[in-house]
């Protein structure tokens, strides 16, 4: 039997670059939150923070023995890059892209979708809570 997780990720930077944080909310297939975490990232860009959130989310999902992932991000850039619709031109995030891309192949199925910011409020709240604590 497959284990499906629904994941919302967000990354934010106050200043871009500036104090940054990543946020992750993991839900079971019924939409119940089962994990919520984030990380303060010092001086980074939004894109760095977005990719960091996705990498941490996928690593956690692997630890939770998931084999199917629905991942939602409010970063159109990151979603399009991971879906191979857009190239990664920024050298500073190429290694993060590769790391995230490789992690997606450790699951039977991964769907990455762009959502509007208002549909990603829980992950955004994790980011803002961390940034408020550190800035």
Predicted regions and their residues:
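Residues at secondary-structure transition points
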Residues: 43-48, 52, 88-91
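RNase H catalytic domain
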Residues: 12-16, 55-127, 131-134
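RNase H-like nuclease fold core
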Residues: 2-48, 59-63, 67
């Amino acid at each position: 039997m497959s284990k499906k997780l629904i994941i919302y990720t967000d990354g934010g930077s106050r200043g871009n670059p500036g104090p940054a944080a990543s946020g992750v909310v993991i839900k079971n297939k019924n939409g119940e939150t089962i994990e919520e975490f984030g990380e303060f990232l010092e001086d980074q860009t939004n894109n760095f923070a977005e990719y960091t959130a996705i990498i941490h989310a996928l690593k956690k999902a692997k630890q939770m023995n998931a084999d199917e992932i629905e991942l939602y991000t409010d970063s159109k850039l990151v979603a399009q890059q991971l879906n191979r619709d857009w190239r990664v031109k920024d050298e500073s995030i190429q290694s993060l892209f590769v790391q995230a891309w490789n992690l997606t192949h450790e699951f039977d199925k991964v769907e990455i979708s762009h959502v509007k910011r208002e549909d990603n409020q829980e992950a955004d709240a994790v980011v803002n809570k961390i940034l408020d604590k550190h800035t």
